[in-house]
Amino acid sequence: MRHGKKDNHLGRTVTHRRALLSNMASSLILHKRISTTVPKAKELRKYVEPLITKAKADSTHSRRTVFSYLQNKDSVKELFDNVVEKIAARPGGYTRILKTGARIGDNADMCIIELVDYNETYVKDSEVKVAAKRTRRSTAAKKDDSSESTGAEPQA
């Protein structure tokens, strides 16, 4: 019986799945954004977010624990030196999954999983939208403006 076993096995053995998630987590930390299938991205999110939370406490024990999951010195160094500084104030939700449609060969649902604070396009768009907001004028003000611009005076 599989009561309470809600992890997606991704059609792999336990060791193959651990290696897959470890490699994908290292790639995500190093490149900040990777393209993959939706089920893999959802499993990767469950795998990498606790590692990022653990990296906030920069201690020897947390470094060794994260290294036991990632097994890549470069990605551990990147995580503790650069990524944690940027997400220090965030209480969780360090990754974002953006669906990109179906893959051409086998129609698999594809997506992009990325670290939230590293996407500059969303940050710039939100700042521009805040600056571009204007108040709306009433229709009466528009009628007054149009009558003044034509030179016609309203009759009393």
Curated annotation (Swiss-Prot):
Belongs to the bacterial ribosomal protein bL17 family. This is Large ribosomal subunit protein bL17. InterPro entries: Ribosomal_bL17, Ribosomal_bL17_CS, Ribosomal_bL17_sf. Pfam families: Ribosomal_L17 (PF01196). Part of the 50S ribosomal subunit. Contacts protein L32. Residues 131-140 have a biased composition (Basic residues). The keyword Ubl conjugation does not apply. GO terms for cellular component: cytosolic large ribosomal subunit. One of its GO terms (molecular function) is structural constituent of ribosome. Keywords: Ribonucleoprotein, Ribosomal protein. It comes from Cytophaga hutchinsonii (strain ATCC 33406 / DSM 1761 / CIP 103989 / NBRC 15051 / NCIMB 9469 / D465). PROSITE patterns: RIBOSOMAL_L17 (PS01167). PANTHER family: LARGE RIBOSOMAL SUBUNIT PROTEIN BL17M (PTHR14413:SF16), RIBOSOMAL PROTEIN L17 (PTHR14413). The keyword Ribonucleoprotein applies. GO terms for biological process: translation. Residues 131-156 are annotated as: Disordered.
